Amino acid sequence: MAMKKLLIASLLFSSATVYGAEGFVVKDIHFEGLQRVAVGAALLSMPVRTGDTVNDEDISNTIRALFATGNFEDVRVLRDGNTLLVQVKERPTIASITFSGNKSVKDDMLKQNLEASGVRVGESLDRTTLSDIEKGLEDFYYSVGKYSASVKAVVTPLPRNRVDLKLVFQEGVSAKIQQINIVGNHAFSTEELISHFQLRDEVPWWNVVGDRKYQKQKLAGDLETLRSYYLDRGYARFNIDSTQVSLTPDKKGIYITVNITEGDQYKLSGVQVSGNLAGHSAEIENLTKIEPGELYNGTKVTKMEDDIKKLLGRYGYAYPRVQSQPEINDADKTVKLRVNVDAGNRFYVRKIRFEGNDTSKDSVLRREMRQMEGAWLGSDLVDQGKERLNRLGFFETVDTDTQRVPGSLDQVDVVYKVKERNTGSFNFGIGYGTESGVSFQAGVQQDNWLGTGYSVGINGTKNDYQTYSELSVTNPYFTVDGVSLGGRIFYNDFEADDADLSDYTNKSYGTDVTLGFPINEYNTLRAGLGYVHNKLSNMQPQIAMDRYLESMGDPDASDFAADDFTFNYGWTYNKLDRGYFPTDGSRVNLTGKVTIPGSDNEYYKVSLDTATYVPIDNDHKWVVLGRTRWGYGDGLGGKEMPFYENFYAGGSSTVRGFQSNTIGPKAVYKNGAHTSWDDNDDYEDCTQESGCKSDDAVGGNAMAVASLEFITPTPFISEKYANSVRTSFFWDMGTVWDTNWDPSSAPSDVPDYSDPGNIRMSAGIALQWMSPLGPLVFSYAQPFKKYDGDKAEQFQFNIGKTW
């Protein structure tokens, strides 16, 4: 009864009248409403203890302290004689958190944001925080143009003061831009200006960048694009006065109006450089030269500032400040650019450290460095080290960090942070390819043997037409100067007829050794010696083969053996940004070989492969790839180049959409030769005196292949796997011909195989995936230019480890 009177009194009078201005001595403290929170924990959070004399201010502080714990959503403090009665209502505990209706935002991202706000399973539920989260999520949807979106938190009570929390999303549809207006433009049309925007009110089918869905961030980017467009064309006084974004009543349409002031065009009258140039005034002035009467260009000014910083960075000035201040003369419409440079301190490298290389030895990474310890810091040298590490192929990512040495004004440590990839593989499996049929592979390949950088491989494969095995070893640093040494031994049993070639069997084995000589950062020369033994059998006489056998002095042979020694040479230019799935740069690879004295054959052979990647966006997700492959070979000393050394085209690695090796010259079998076999191994003979035409490819001594690809982001693939999957649209073309072909030696219905103009073409789509099994390549191509005897194969794929 006394407590009820006290509560009524507290509503009618101030706290001072309740507790008394002089206060009272607390004899005991009682709690009501505690469930999850222990009494001891609650007492520790209070500033009042038994025996204290308390007044109104102490009671207010007690209430605030209990609220501050975050455990209570209601607190009342009452007096019952000399007992302090604390009535609390605990906040419920979150038992579970679920989401419904969220399509644009993933559950994991929502959980991270909730946890950052203190909302997680097992914690108390703060309804105020929940309201802020609802509003924040709705603001996010508004920023991406979904103005009809709503987010509601549904709290379901459970026993023992627990609750289930469910966030219910109604995302709605994105508001589409109905019209973009630019007001105040006179020099350029609205259509011209909007054509450079990401946001559009109209998007043609071919525009893969434009978007009618409104997003606040994209609008901000487009306004910067508009500003740069004018500043780059001399409009130094250009200004965006205001921007209005209007929403239609149904919240499904957006109207954007941008008000601008163009101003006049201004020309640069000169550039004045001042400040601490660190003795490099001449080089800096070369970077600031302008042509007389050149229009003011904001992008060029920014590039000039960056170039000055890079120049100073190469000389150890790691943190230079470069500021350009345009002085505008409205009278003669000119701009004088005043550039202030402060080179700052020159920094020296105390240490170069590596992090993340758990397998690779420090020495393997350190030998790729161009920046030296103890020397001044060169930003270009640090970047070269990063490029070289990337090209090793040992790492998924390589990052650099320049860290100042504590207590030093002129020293830094350079840290290379790497994430190693699995450079070794033990493979035993089965694959299938449209070109090779069922294939069995087994092998051990380690590109970074025991962390030493050595490449060691024991590999083998067996399919419908080939049995192949190889042992190879390469030491990329045979000498401290970077001269590499590589060698291999191999065995190959090749059934040509099963590979859609003219019929013969070749059992070969051999070895070679090669030295690589680095010329500079991007160029390497190679030279080596090789030996190969070829044992040919089951040769069915055909014109190209007969020509070779005649040049060897054994025209009627059905079996033949040759031992050849070769001088092998090559040159590689490699400026790709990374080893696998590159997106920028070029690679040129020239290889060749020529027989040397002691060989049964006398011939030479040269191949040239090129690849150029050109990114068309800043993120390197859209890339144009151009590839070419050229090959030529011929005999020496009156002998022919062996037919089994011919070039071939067709298949997934050359001209897609055609069966492997089927492009180019076909076998013309001589009278009496076995020309074809059925399923019972019964054969038919050629009975024509002039020879029999066939569809069996024989290749040629000359080849030309070109490909143009447009690499695009792969749909439905998350960013996590973007670097292991690649999609592209392609156009392939190529041909193979025989420069020694004599049309008079064949029947009249046989094409002229010496004509290089018989070009095949195809177009299609390809998907590449670096799967756990190894490379997996799908392609679908439609040949749209082909010739008699060509074999089309629209869908092609290869699964399994390739060597």
From Swiss-Prot:
Q: What is this protein called?
A: Outer membrane protein assembly factor BamA
Q: Which UniProt keywords apply?
A: Cell outer membrane, Membrane, Repeat, Signal, Transmembrane, Transmembrane beta strand
A GO BP term here is: Gram-negative-bacterium-type cell outer membrane assembly
Enumerate the subcellular locations listed in this protein's record, separating them with semicolons. Answer: Cell outer membrane
State the protein's purpose.
Part of the outer membrane protein assembly complex, which is involved in assembly and insertion of beta-barrel proteins into the outer membrane. Constitutes, with BamD, the core component of the assembly machinery.
Q: Where is the signal peptide?
A: 1-20
Family of the protein in this entry: Belongs to the BamA family.
InterPro entries (alphabetical):
Bac_surfAg_D15 (IPR000184), BamA/TamA_POTRA (IPR010827), D15-like (IPR039910), OM_assembly_BamA (IPR023707), POTRA (IPR034746)
Q: Name one Pfam family in it.
A: Omp85
Is Membrane tagged as a keyword?
Answer: yes
Q: What NCBIfam families does the annotation carry?
A: OM_YaeT, PRK11067.1
Kindly list the residue ranges recorded as spanning the membrane.
none
What do the Gene Ontology cellular component annotations say?
Bam protein complex
Q: How is this protein organized at the quaternary level?
A: Part of the Bam complex, which is composed of the outer membrane protein BamA, and four lipoproteins BamB, BamC, BamD and BamE.
Q: Which residues form the POTRA domain?
A: 24-91, 92-172, 175-263, 266-344, 347-421
